[in-house]
């Protein structure tokens, strides 16, 4: 497989386009667990969204390429909602409403087989080095008291992860998806807006 067309990169993987497929190559061989977990999460979400208007790339293969773990799925052509907002600022409110409708549709799905968002948050709190044990205990107690839901939470939902083309609406990058409280997922999106799109956070 030729991997000449570089598309994007994150801390742990690079993405290439090859023959109509998106190939996510994990940067280190020891990322095997991350690769397999991401593939399992993607597959479970893919099955659940089968009856939704939201589409997502079809996962085709998990493999090892040049000693590194890889996931191969459909390469989705089109423009992201972020690109559309940047190119058409006069339609920002329209695109933002579309974005909200998509997130509401995601949260309408129930995902009892996914890992729990609460468990992920608890692990992150426990490993924080910037706060003392008393503050950690307070945060964990508040987290435990919050309502327990099994709604689908994307975990990284922002306009750059929504692609629009002639075939419909696609949501990508499901590696952080969990089951949990939709309000937490919305709060995460708002935080991403504050960091990356302050004008959208104000809208």
Stretch-by-stretch model annotation:
Residues 14-17, 141-184:
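Active-site acidic catalytic loop and adjacent metal/ATP-binding pocket
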Residues 46-62:
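Conserved HxN/HPN-centered segment at the entrance to the catalytic loop
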Residues 4-38, 84:
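ATP-binding glycine-rich loop module of kinase domains
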Residues 66-80:
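Conserved short submotifs of the Hanks-type protein kinase catalytic core
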